[in-house]
Amino acid sequence: MQHAGPVRRELGVPSVMNLLGPLANPAGVRRQVVGVADRDRAPLVAGALARLGGGAEHALVVHGRVGMDEISPVGITDVWEVRAGHVSTWELDPARYGLAITDPAALRGGDPAANAARIEGLLADARAGGDAAGLAALLLNAGAAVYVAGIVPTYEEGIARARGVVATGAARAALDRLRRAAGA
């Protein structure tokens, strides 16, 4: 799979590798959040996660209806939740969590350096320095990861935990520890 990445990026369009990557992870991941850009493919990914290798312990397959392959703070996100071989579906409305934004352009990324700086800014300033869209996307998706990891019993509590970790500076401290460990 490592050799397919550069070719996939060079193609510039989604390919079968976008679907196979999360399913063929050699680490045997049992808990994960998987974003799918094409809504029609999401049930297939969820079904495969439910069946592969005994099935995912807990996974969320997500599709933001604005065309995002992640949980979107703009409009509804469709969710396929996989637990112990079973798939259930639900809709996630960011307004329910006070994290809805109206302008999708506010989520637009840049080059890797700009994107990294944006994340660092979000982690360094719990108020997000005016980047409400970035903070909403971060909390919605981090909340899903915390929930799927089994740290909290509900998605709502996952968002609350993510918010607390960002607000206290613990998220930034964890990033700094990771960098030191990696020698970066």
Regions found by a protein language model. Give the residues of each.
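Glycine-rich anion-binding loops and their surrounding alpha/beta cores
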Residues: 1-184
